[in-house]
Amino acid sequence: MSTTKYFEDFYLGEKFYIPAKTMTDAHFLFFAGMTGDNHPIHYDDEYAKTTRFGKRVAHGLLVASMTASGASTLSPMIEGSIVAFVEQSSRFLKPVLI
């Protein structure tokens, strides 16, 4: 069992790992249905071939949601100390190709 960590116990740049996930078309279709983001870059292979990426690209917010703290090694450390998740910022360095 991990020791409970509070806000002041963390340091900038600290890393927590999330197990690898295999995404399928079902994930992308479900996300598009839930959010209404039906841009063809996410589901149309022929359209995607005409873009600078050349392949379909995962929804940015779907990718960000896969980093949820509950799925990481952070979860057991904050279980008894977290009150609410207030904010998250993301910077996408490269596209996640489908």
Predicted regions and their residues:
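Catalytic strand-loop segment that frames the active site of acyl-thioester-processing enzymes
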Residues: 1-58
